[in-house]
Design a protein with these regions (language model features):
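Active-site signature of alpha/beta-hydrolase-fold catalytic machinery across serine-
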Residues: 60-64
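The feature captures the conserved acid-bearing segment of alpha/beta-hydrolase catalytic domains
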Residues: 67, 71-152
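C-terminal helix/juxtamembrane-tail motif
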Residues: 142-174
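Generic structural signal of hydrophobic/aromatic residues within well-ordered alpha-helices
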Residues: 26, 30, 34, 87, ...
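Generic hydrophobic, helix-prone segments enriched in Leu/Val/Ile
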Residues: 19, 38, 91, 145, ...
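Short, flexible coil/linker elements and helix-boundary hinge sites characteristic
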Residues: 5, 16, 41-42, 131, ...
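Gly/Ala-rich beta-loop-alpha elbow adjacent to hydrolase catalytic centers
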Residues: 50-54, 58
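A conserved cap/lid and substrate-binding interface adjacent to the catalytic center
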Residues: 1-49, 66-73, 95-96, 172-174
Length: 174
């Protein structure tokens, strides 16, 4: 899993190249539209929200907007790790209000692995095995939250069905 430098971040800050390339592909249109709407409706807050790959893109979106002077915050669900520890520390300083929601058993917050020099940014809110919402420690990798779920308990269903009774990626006919 290739990592690349993130524009505007400190020396040594690296991000997952695939997630970053996906953001760069969309950034021009997204940033232009958000800038237009922010100017038109200056009292409204900007929130970049996403699940799974969309969560990784929400992190990039928020960092990009904030570097351009647009106040934004990220709210993510089932987010994969986006960058290394230098990027994560920088991102926390850029977007201190971000919230990352994880669910017990969701496999996606375990990739890319820490062993490949990926780290989460705080703050994690963890839906534990009983469905209770736990505020995790400020490390981004709290062993009593998602990071502590045994590998044998990880599955795809928790990723698509484990968040507030919302089923992601499904369409239903009435």
């Amino acid at each position: 899993m290739s990592q690349s430098p993130y524009d505007g971040s400190p020396e040594g800050a690296l991000v997952h190249q695939g997630f970053y390339n996906a953001w760069i592909e969309a950034a021009g249109e997204v940033v232009a539209e958000v800038a237009r709407l922010s100017a038109q409706f200056p009292v409204y807050a900007v929130a970049c929200v996403g699940h799974s790959l969309g969560a990784a893109l929400a992190v990039h979106c928020t960092a990009d907007l904030r570097q351009r002077g647009i106040e934004a915050v990220a709210y993510t669900y089932g987010q994969p790790r986006v960058g290394n520890d230098i990027f994560s520390a920088w991102y926390e300083s850029v977007d201190p209000g971000s919230l990352r929601v994880t669910a017990y058993g969701d496999i996606v917050p375990h990739v890319p692995p820490q062993a490949l020099d990926y780290r989460f940014q705080p703050t994690e809110l963890f839906l534990n095995a009983t469905g209770a919402l736990v505020v995790c420690d400020a490390s981004g990798e709290d062993p009593t939250c998602s990071n502590g779920v045994p590998v044998s308990e990880l599955d795809q269903d928790a990723h698509t069905q484990g968040y507030f009774d919302v089923v992601f990626g499904a369409c239903y006919l009435a």
